[in-house]
């Protein structure tokens, strides 16, 4: 891969996908990052956790998050470019995913408010009443500085993986709305204008089946704050998204969808974010490789550039292959999501296929991205651990994306479940049939089915090995198929 391709997210996207939708808008967005946005991002990362002004001088609760003015200008660039509104105008998630990839190459933290604002808009559009959509959807789709931001608040103090056991926020009916009381411990995009929130209606059963999803605005009908921010988290990275602890005290909210389908709606929100997280991890990997290539081409060791040493070049080329495989798998999850993002329960087989691909993609990409970023630090030697140089940041950022929207452990177990309960692996093998080598496909099918036939304890304990193998097999198969279309000569050489 040419270094100029590696240095540019748009060039890399074009290399992987061929013709891009809205290419002019994508290049204009990249240009803004190169000329202005990157400086804002660096300053935001170095400044650390922003201040929280809880009260104004008159003693009124305001909960203002105090970033520098340049931060807010930078944040709005993505909204103006279309990270939310283009999805509804195009009736496709592709442009939003591409804009998110570019964003993550420069500032992974900013992808979070963009993605969860999109997830808020999609959940509202799919499951909100006509009155709710008319009132709250237009502000999320604005293209100027008045655009609203969304958020998705599920996690509480006891943890986010086991929502059925750990969500203690209670919802009480109050006329045409509900009143929510509880605390959200990891509330990304604290200060958002609108949030979708997991809560348990009074009298609902314990466990995940008793949860429902609610739409909660920042302000009550009377204009007062509808939720308060207890504090902001001091994170190792993604400092451009304020993550806080949010207190709900009889906070006004509206039910989305039906009360008995809440868990499905919550998972819809999470799975959209998982697919975009997979692409984001690869954007970080690309950035880390670009930084290491630039440095290694200039650094002289033993009489020649580090990049020209055979072992270094081999290691670099191996990681470029991993980058391209990971991107192909992440993009496959976007393609499968694009087929089903408007579906409602009960879901089709295509939706269960998307779920499996999303788990595979989120698991593998977020696992390999920190490894690539750590290697990029190693290329820099001792300079790689100094905060004054850019490469250490990408390792910090990659580690956060491993945790976001469910750990690797969670992705494996959820992926195992969708294979066991929905037979999603059969759908995946059918999807890959025309692109995969028949012998390799048969062997992978045999391995998966053999594993699923094991006793439950053995099946879970050994799940990572088979899940990793299936992720890599899927990644390489869909990449080869895509290259056969977009780069036929190159694909033939690989074959």
Predicted segment positions?
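A glycine-rich, basic-preceded beta-loop-alpha segment at the flavin cofactor/substrate interface
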Residues: 222-226, 230, 235, 242-273, ...
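A short core secondary-structure module
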Residues: 177, 181-226
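Extended amphipathic alpha-helical segments enriched in small hydrophobics
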Residues: 274-344, 426-487
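Extended, charge-enriched "interface" segments that sit outside catalytic cores
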Residues: 1-89
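Glycine-rich phosphate/cofactor-binding loops in nucleotide/flavin-utilizing enzymes
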Residues: 4-8, 383-442
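Internal helix-loop-helix
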Residues: 57-146, 188-190, 404
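Internal maturation/activation junctions in enzymes
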Residues: 128-176, 331-351, 358, 373, ...
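Charged, glycine-rich active-site and insertion segments that engage polyanionic ligands
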Residues: 352-383
């Amino acid at each position: 891969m040419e270094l100029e391709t590696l240095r540019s997210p748009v060039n890399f996207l074009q290399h992987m996908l061929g013709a891009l939708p809205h290419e002019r808008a994508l290049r204009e967005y990249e240009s803004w990052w190169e000329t202005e946005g990157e400086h804002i991002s660096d300053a935001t990362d170095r400044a650390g956790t922003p201040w929280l002004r809880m009260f104004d001088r008159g003693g009124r609760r305001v909960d203002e998050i105090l970033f520098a003015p340049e931060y807010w200008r930078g944040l709005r660039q993505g909204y103006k470019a279309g990270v939310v509104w283009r999805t509804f105008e195009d009736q496709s998630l592709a442009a939003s995913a591409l804009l998110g990839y570019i964003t993550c190459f420069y500032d992974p933290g900013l992808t979070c408010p963009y993605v969860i604002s999109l997830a808020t808009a999609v959940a509202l559009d799919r499951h909100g009443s006509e009155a709710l959509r008319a009132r709250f959807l237009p502000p999320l789709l604005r293209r100027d500085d008045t655009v609203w931001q969304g958020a998705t608040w599920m996690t509480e103090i006891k943890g986010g993986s086991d929502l059925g056991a750990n969500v203690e926020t209670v919802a009480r009916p109050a006329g045409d709305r509900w009143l929510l009381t509880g605390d959200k411990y990891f509330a990304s995009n604290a200060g958002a204008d609108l949030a979708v929130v997991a809560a348990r209606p009074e009298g609902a059963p314990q466990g995940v089946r008793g949860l429902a999803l609610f739409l909660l605005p920042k302000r009550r009908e009377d204009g007062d704050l509808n939720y308060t921010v207890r504090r902001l988290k001091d994170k190792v990275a993604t400092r451009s998204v304020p993550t806080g602890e949010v207190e709900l005290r009889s906070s006004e909210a509206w039910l989305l969808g039906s009360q008995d389908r809440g868990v499905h709606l919550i998972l819809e929100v999470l799975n959209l974010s998982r697919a975009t997280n997979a692409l984001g991890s690869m954007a970080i990997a690309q950035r880390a490789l670009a930084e290491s290539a630039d440095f290694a081409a200039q650094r002289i060791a033993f009489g020649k550039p580090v990049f020209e040493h055979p072992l270094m070049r081999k290691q670099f080329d191996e990681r470029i292959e991993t980058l391209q495989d990971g991107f192909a798998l992440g993009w496959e999850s976007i393609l499968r999501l694009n087929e089903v993002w408007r579906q409602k329960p009960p879901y089709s087989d295509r939706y269960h296929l998307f779920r499996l691909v999303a788990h595979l993609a989120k698991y593998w990409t977020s696992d390999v991205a920190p490894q690539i970023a750590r290697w990029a630090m190693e290329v820099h030697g001792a300079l790689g651990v100094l905060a004054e140089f850019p490469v250490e940041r990408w390792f910090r950022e990659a580690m956060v994306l491993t945790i976001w929207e469910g750990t690797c452990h969670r992705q494996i177990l959820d992926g195992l479940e969708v294979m066991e309960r929905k037979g999603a692996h059969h759908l995946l093998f059918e999807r890959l049939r025309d692109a995969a080598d028949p012998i390799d496909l048969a062997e992978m099918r045999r391995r998966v089915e053999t594993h699923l036939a094991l006793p439950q304890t053995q099946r879970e304990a050994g799940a990572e090995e088979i899940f990793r193998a299936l992720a890599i097999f899927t990644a390489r198969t869909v990449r080869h198929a895509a290259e056969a279309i977009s780069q036929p000569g190159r694909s033939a050489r690989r074959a």
